[in-house]
A protein has these predicted regions:
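Short, ordered loop/turn segments at secondary-structure junctions
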Residues: 11-13, 41-46, 81-82, 114-115, ...
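Glycine-rich oxoanion-binding loops at beta->alpha junctions
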Residues: 51-107, 116, 155-157, 169
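N-terminal phosphate-binding or glycine-rich loops at protein starts, especially the Walker A/P-loop
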Residues: 1-54
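Short glycine/serine/threonine-rich phosphate/pyrophosphate-binding segments
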Residues: 15-25, 48-49, 93-95, 115-123, ...
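Gly-rich Lys/Arg/Thr-decorated short loops/hinges at beta-loop-alpha junctions or inter-strand turns
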Residues: 2-8, 69-83, 142-152, 179-182, ...
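C-terminal non-catalytic interaction/assembly regions of soluble proteins
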Residues: 255-414
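Accessory alpha-helical/coil subdomains and C-terminal extensions
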Residues: 38, 100, 108-113, 119-131, ...
């Protein structure tokens, strides 16, 4: 044994596939044979600052446990939304973190997360370069928002898209039964990018045309045009279903919400109420039966309806991250590129973290129709392969069996 170790952590919002990436990292480490112990930091970067670790090499000892971890929703290691300061202003956290790396003989650190997590990867990488540390720091992408740059699509998005499309179809069936005029507004996550809301179009088939309208943050929202859209559609349909992103804004850039937004540590406004605001608008101006539905966290933790394509790619990205570290790559995020749409295929690579952190990928305007109330075929074609395939789960007492997480309880001593 060479006594070198590695560490992995997760942060940001959970997905149905982020544990598949964790499983991929663990699998890659076991195949590598270059690391004696794989530590898992509990609650992201805070786990290092609080010296709370798991020995994943012991806790995930076999293929059966690894496969169960792979299909478990949310984040096995827990999460945080902690923003590291600029080390030029205050390097105390960095000194502590890298002292921990030395203490545990960490030679590679893998951080699984979205935009804000990649900001952490960038800051740690810059500090490592400053102190000439040889620790390899690799970002492993995830986000249901699908807004990370330098990657065709992000792990977690495909499963969330599959859940949204399936839910939208089931909502449509629920509305089919009524012969009265009604409007159903479905609010879907997406602060700055409408990828998830666009995925609702995958619910359409040879008998279902819902959602009848899709409103995205990429196009300024016009209340009068929205009301005109609804009135016109009600002339030919009893039941109109609308998909709307939580982050829709008017031409002045103001959010369409029913409540005042608050911001997190990264300055992102925590939105709620776009669907409710539109419900009130329809009720006051059109007067038909109307309801709003906020899918909320269900869209990001529905492992029972995960995309097999998504989980497979998430796992492969975790494994590839380990290969990159072995090759000496650092200050990078592992990526995938779509090499073919029919048949669908991807290739794995990496990109410098500096071109990814603090950037966001929006839907191209040309993939949205001219009226800004639906998507074009190009976007549908992009989305379709990502939700393909079903994940097999083990059931007990009628519900799925997932990995227990006693280490995330406040009274647990690691």
């Amino acid at each position: 044994m060479n006594q070198s170790n590695c560490m992995v952590a997760q942060s940001g919002g959970p997905t149905a596939a982020i544990n598949a990436s964790l499983a991929g990292v663990i699998s890659g480490i076991k195949k590598s044979g270059k690391y004696d112990t794989c530590y898992g930091a509990i609650n992201g970067i805070l786990g290092i600052l609080n010296e709370r670790y798991l020995n994943l090499s012991q806790m995930i000892p076999d293929e059966k446990t690894l496969n169960r971890l792979k299909v478990t929703p949310a984040m096995y290691l827990g999460s945080c939304r902690h923003k590291l300061p600029d080390y030029k202003d205050d390097d105390s956290a960095y000194v502590f973190i890298f002292n921990q790396f030395v203490k545990l003989n960490i030679k590679a650190f893998f951080y699984i997360g979205g935009n804000d997590s990649m900001d952490t990867v960038l800051k740690l990488s810059d500090y490592a370069a400053k102190i000439k540390s040889d620790i390899r720091i690799i970002g492993v992408p995830k986000t249901i928002d699908n807004d990370l740059c330098m990657i065709d699509h992000t792990p977690g998005f495909g499963s969330a898209a599959k859940y949204i499309a399936s839910t939208m179809l089931e909502i449509a069936h629920d509305t089919f039964i009524y012969a009265v005029k009604s409007v159903t507004i479905v609010e879907i996550m997406g602060r700055d990018a409408g990828w998830l809301t666009a995925a609702s179009a995958l619910a359409r088939n040879d008998y279902n045309t819902a959602p009848h309208f899709i409103y995205l943050p990429e196009v300024a929202f016009d209340k009068e045009q929205f009301l005109t859209d609804i009135r016109n559609k009600l002339k030919t349909l009893n039941n109109v279903i609308v998909a709307v992103s939580e982050g829709i804004r008017d031409k002045n850039g103001d959010y369409i919400t029913a409540s005042k937004a608050v911001a997190d540590q990264f300055g992102h406004q925590q939105l709620s109420g776009a669907g409710k605001a539109l419900e009130f608008l329809v009720k006051e101006n059109i007067g038909v039966k109307v309801r709003s539905i906020e899918i909320n966290v269900l869209q990001r933790c529905a492992s029972h309806l995960a995309s097999a394509t998504d989980q497979s790619e998430a796992f492969a990205l975790g494994e590839h991250a380990v290969l990159l570290a072995e090759e000496g790559v650092t200050a990078s995020m592992v990526t995938l590129t779509r090499t073919s749409n029919t048949p669908y295929a991807v290739a794995y690579d990496h990109a410098p973290i500096r071109g990814i952190a603090n950037e966001a990928k929006s839907i191209p305007r040309e993939w949205i129709n001219a009226h800004g109330n639906d998507i074009r075929q190009e976007l549908y074609n992009y989305l379709y392969p990502l939700i393909q395939g079903e994940v097999s789960l083990t059931y007990q007492n009628g519900v799925p069996v997932y990995m227990p997480v006693p280490h995330l309880k406040p009274d647990h001593v690691s």
